[in-house]
């Protein structure tokens, strides 16, 4: 199989499910250019009015925000309160069964205290988490399929339970990662009584902007703590909540030839933070690496051995694009 990469950002082409490219340029890069044609100020004014017009007088909360200890959650809440007149959002945090990072704990605590907000920590049934995660890992190498559905579902369920008409989520993944050419405002699960809004379709999403906004209110990165010196990563400020969760992202490398390093490095190219060559070197050096602490935490949480983990990885390895190196690590054929 010929391995192709985007002419603009260097991302591997043709392996991400549902992704598209045109003339050797990934749709994520093309969508970056499409953002210039969106009237963001108009969308922001629309949102302020939409929130005002759709308040439930019988509810103490104007909206629900699905949150974590990450930068995007801080930015969404900050802008809702400071730019859109929201007084009292209800924050909903869905937990997994992995070990939380000190940074994630600190950031979520800081977010709640900064604006004096209500927070619901939703712990999904732990035995079901283990059962479903094991099943999806062994059968599909898609370990967190079940809990990721909960991360989207629980804020909506909470909103419906309390009669709250609006739910906010972060970026529009289909647009940002090159599956759709349209920057839709509403999530497909929106209905007549509850609207789910992608905040990244109201304010143009970028890692740099989100980080700057979050740091202005005290956001802390993994490097501010000593509990997790993460490997196989392009940064210390994205996906920082829990350690074992990173395996969900890393397994994409085994199936599709990319993981979080490619996603972040190529996004940095689109944002002007890195050159294509710098991103390519970062991908070559780090995209294949499975963080050892994440692997250990994942195996502990779902009660499997590291040998079982390795055997399952080998079973699903995409040998069209990957080959094992001399040390037994799966690597992209074009980068070894």
Q: For each predicted feature, which ranges?
A:
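Nucleotide-activated chemistry modules centered on ATP-dependent adenylation/adenylyltransferase
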Residues: 1-62, 79, 83-336
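Short glycine/serine/threonine-rich phosphate/pyrophosphate-binding segments
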Residues: 71-76, 150
């Amino acid at each position: 199989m010929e391995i192709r990469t985007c002419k603009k950002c260097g991302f591997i082409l043709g392996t991400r499910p549902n992704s598209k490219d045109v003339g050797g340029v990934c749709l994520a890069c093309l969508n970056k250019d499409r953002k210039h044609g969106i009237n963001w100020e108009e969308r922001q004014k629309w949102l302020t009015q939409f929130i005002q017009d759709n308040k439930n007088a019988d509810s103490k909360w104007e909206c629900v925000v699905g949150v974590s200890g990450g930068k995007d959650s801080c930015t969404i809440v900050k802008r809702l309160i400071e730019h859109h007149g929201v007084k009292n959002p209800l924050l909903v945090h869905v937990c997994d069964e992995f070990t939380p990072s000190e940074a994630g704990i600190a950031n979520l605590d800081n977010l709640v205290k900064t604006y004096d907000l209500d927070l619901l920590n939703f712990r999904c049934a732990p035995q079901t988490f283990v059962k479903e995660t094991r099943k999806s890992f062994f059968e599909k190498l898609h370990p967190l399929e079940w809990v990721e559905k909960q991360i989207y579902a629980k804020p909506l369920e909470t909103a419906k339970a309390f009669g709250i008409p609006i739910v906010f989520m972060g970026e529009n993944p289909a647009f940002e990662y090159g599956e759709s050419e349209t920057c839709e405002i509403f999530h497909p699960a929106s209905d007549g009584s509850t609207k789910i809004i992608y905040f990244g379709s109201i304010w143009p999403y970028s890692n740099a902007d989100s980080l700057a906004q979050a740091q202005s209110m005290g956001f802390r990165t993994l490097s501010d703590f000593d509990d997790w010196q993460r490997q196989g990563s392009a940064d210390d400020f994205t996906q920082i909540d829990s350690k074992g969760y990173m395996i969900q992202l890393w397994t994409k490398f085994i199936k599709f030839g990319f993981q979080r390093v490619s996603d972040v490095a190529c996004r940095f190219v689109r944002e002007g933070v890195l050159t294509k060559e710098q991103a390519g070197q970062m991908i070559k050096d780090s995209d294949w690496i499975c963080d050892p602490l994440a692997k250990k935490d994942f195996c502990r949480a779902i009660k499997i051995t590291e040998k079982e983990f390795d055997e399952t990885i080998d079973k699903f390895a995409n040998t069209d694009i990957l080959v094992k190196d001399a040390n037994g690590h799966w690597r992209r054929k074009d980068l070894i």
